[in-house]
Amino acid sequence: MSDNLYKKVVAKNRRASFDYSIEENIEAGIILTGSELKSIREGKVSLADSHAAESAGELYLYNCHIAEYEKANRFNHAPLRPRKLLVHKREMQKIIGKIKLKGYTLIALSLYFNHKNKIKIELGLARGKKQYDKRESIKEDDWKREQGRILRDKK
């Protein structure tokens, strides 16, 4: 397997593609404490309802729940604290410009270890779907599944 393609996914936001139409994917680093890192290695992280927003010219990840590390002492972390994201300056300015447009949100899609064993987060620049859009995507998925069954049965 190529080094560039290696990803060990720790957490995934499964509802993201159902609730949002994702237009662009962005990879970012994330600043963590030691107890957060150990908790992520154990898989105790949830990306449900997590999103990124701009604060004082920086990007921060909000509502990402990383459980407290059981073996940590009194210096344990707060599970829902805002976490700073690491993105190149030009890319950050481009993202912030798009976020300020009406209807765009930066949501967390997945959290993973890259080939250098660094934790990265995949963010999606997305627009929220209306209820009728969600029903339409369910119909499309059902039809694609049905087509697969029909083609498989003919062979």
Per-segment meaning from a language model:
Residues 126, 134-151:
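Flexible glycine-rich active-site/ligand-binding loops centered on an Asp-His dyad
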